[in-house]
Amino acid sequence: MQLSTTPTLEGFTITEYCGVVTGEAILGANIFRDFFAGVRDIVGGRSGAYEKELRKARLIAFKELEEQAKELGANAVVGIDIDYETVGKDSSMLMVTVSGTAVKVSR
């Protein structure tokens, strides 16, 4: 499955638009508590543990997006947008959302 943030895929022709697809993942409050309590993990202004959790959430969201596209018979998703939102009481959770257009492409 081809995944792209661009509206087209170089070298491919979009033959059919199958529909909008999305994927979501939510990081619970514990990651934030661990993040802020574990400031010692920050090296050079970055937290390896926090980045690992964000990467995991992104992978989950992309997997959902790809599964939806396959269900629609698509072999690619174009125009992918990745968003991060804080949700929940006191913005204690982080939601990763990906969306795009499922398409069928050919060379």
Swiss-Prot record:
Annotated InterPro entries: UPF0145_dom_sf (IPR035439), UPF0145_YbjQ-like (IPR002765)
Domain of life, source organism: Bacteria
Gene3D superfamilies: Hypothetical protein apc22750. Chain B
Protein family according to the UniProt entry: Belongs to the UPF0145 family.
HAMAP family found in the cross-reference section: UPF0145
NCBIfam families recorded: PRK02877.1
Name the UniProt record assigns to this protein: UPF0145 protein Spro_1658
